[in-house]
């Protein structure tokens, strides 16, 4: 019984670590996406203000925000990539996500450079939405993968709980049989001969 409980606890600890890592991956990727969207929004606002001939200081503030967001997104994405990938499917998904991130990040970098050099036509025709959509597809795939990991961990934990409960009940039944047998044997071999 103790061996089975130890096995279940060890298995649950491994699954808990797996769930924790999955949640960290989800958080890092979600933060990366949020910061990239923040950079994109700042660039779009700066582009609009540039087209409307607003003062350079207003535009410069937005450009600083966009550049800072792009730098922060790189740091966040590196932390995401530093987390170990499990099976071959997850490693392939990680590589695809890395490619789509690099493409989206590069498109935003180019857009910022074009805006800083006042090339509005290049800024407006940058394929940022396409690269963002590609990243979002990978982002959603990660969400599904992490949900799958969480569901599998939950199902396995439930199975371990049921096995532990079955072993515990079995041990109680075996103990009751042993005690009943011992009482019967004591009565048959010790108490009944003394009654004569």
Question: Which ranges hold each PLM region?
Answer:
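Hydrophobic alpha-helical transmembrane segments of multipass integral membrane proteins
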Residues: 2, 39, 173-177
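N-terminal membrane-insertion alpha helix
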Residues: 2-23, 160-163, 183-184
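Membrane-proximal N-terminal soluble sensing/regulatory segments of transmembrane proteins
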Residues: 11-99, 110-131
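Alpha-helical heptad-repeat coiled-coil segments that mediate oligomerization/polymerization in large
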Residues: 121-135, 139, 143-167
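Selective recognition of signaling/oligomerization transmembrane alpha-helices
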Residues: 149-196
């Amino acid at each position: 019984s103790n061996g089975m409980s130890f096995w279940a606890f060890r298995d649950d600890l491994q699954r808990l670590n797996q769930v924790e890592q999955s949640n960290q991956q989800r958080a890092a990727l979600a933060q990366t996406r949020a910061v990239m969207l923040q950079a994109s929004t700042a660039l779009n606002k700066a582009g609009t203000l540039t087209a409307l001939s607003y003062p350079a200081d207003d535009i410069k503030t937005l450009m600083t925000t966009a550049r800072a967001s792009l730098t922060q997104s790189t740091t966040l994405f590196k932390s995401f990539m530093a987390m170990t990938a499990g099976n071959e499917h997850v490693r392939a998904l990680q590589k695809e996500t890395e490619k789509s991130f690099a493409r989206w990040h590069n498109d935003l970098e180019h857009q910022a450079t074009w805006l800083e050099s006042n090339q509005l036509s290049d800024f407006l025709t940058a394929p940022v939405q396409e690269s963002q959509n590609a990243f979002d597809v990978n982002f959603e795939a990660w969400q599904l993968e992490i949900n799958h990991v969480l569901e599998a961990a939950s199902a396995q934990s439930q199975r371990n709980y049921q096995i532990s409960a079955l072993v515990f009940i079995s041990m109680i039944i075996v103990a009751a049989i042993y005690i009943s047998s011992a009482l019967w044997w004591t009565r048959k071999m010790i108490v009944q001969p003394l009654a004569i």
